[in-house]
């Protein structure tokens, strides 16, 4: 048994449909930290680095109020990809031991997805990152892939091993390459 406070500290979860508050982008990304940006200006530098790692910084700098931009309830002023990347930045800023991305790159183009995944490989060394995805390209550099069907584990291995196996993973991979 783990105390709930430990789980909250050690696990970050980014769902496909994430939640943003009616607040500024900087406060949305910093949400969950113990210190507020107003109390500790150094947090803004960390927010900006997390935004860069999540490939949302350039978009934010293009907004008239940059990090002070109000996003509206549930992030209505942002695109789906911008919402997902803002939530990924929030999780990266928390720097948990375990990061779970639950199809949270689905609204991001493949080039941006690739850059985010490269950044994750650099920034999350020595930590556990679980990526749940329907797009096989998201999983190409994974250490291990678990394929689930009807809630059951049907295949497990490296991406290369699963391609060689010629099962469901390989079939979907070939279909998605077309």
Predicted regions and their residues:
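Conserved H-loop
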Residues: 126-133
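ABC nucleotide-binding domain signature
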Residues: 5, 11-15, 130
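ABC ATPase nucleotide-binding domain "signature" region
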Residues: 79-80, 86-91, 131
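C-terminal portion of ABC ATPase nucleotide-binding domains
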Residues: 62-66, 103, 118, 122-126, ...
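ABC ATPase nucleotide-binding domain signature
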Residues: 10-19, 74-75, 136
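A short, proline-enriched helix->beta-strand linker immediately N-terminal to the Walker B motif
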Residues: 93-97, 126
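Helix N-cap at the start of a conserved alpha-helix in ABC-type nucleotide-binding domains
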Residues: 110-112
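ABC ATPase nucleotide-binding domain helical subdomain, centered on the C-loop/LSGGQ "ABC signature"
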Residues: 1, 8, 26-73, 117-118, ...
């Amino acid at each position: 048994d783990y105390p709930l406070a430990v789980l909250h500290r050690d696990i970050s979860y980014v769902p496909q449909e994430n939640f943003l508050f009616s607040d500024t982008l900087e406060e949305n990304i910093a949400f969950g930290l113990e210190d507020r940006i107003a109390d500790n200006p150094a947090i803004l530098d960390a927010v900006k680095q997390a935004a860069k790692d999540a490939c949302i910084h350039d978009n934010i700098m293009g907004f008239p109020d940059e990090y002070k931009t109000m996003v509206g309830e549930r992030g209505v002023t942002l695109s789906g990809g911008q919402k997902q990347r803002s939530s990924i930045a929030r999780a990266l800023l928390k720097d948990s031991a375990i990061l779970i991305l639950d199809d949270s790159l689905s609204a991001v183009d493949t080039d941006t997805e690739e850059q985010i995944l490269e950044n994750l490989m650099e920034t999350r060394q020595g930590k556990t990152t679980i990526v749940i995805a329907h797009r096989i390209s998201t999983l190409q550099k994974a250490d291990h892939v678990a394929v689930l069907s009807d809630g059951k584990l049907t295949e497990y291995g490296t991406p290369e091993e699963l391609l060689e196996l010629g099962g469901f993973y390989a079939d979907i991979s070939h279909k998605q390459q077309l």
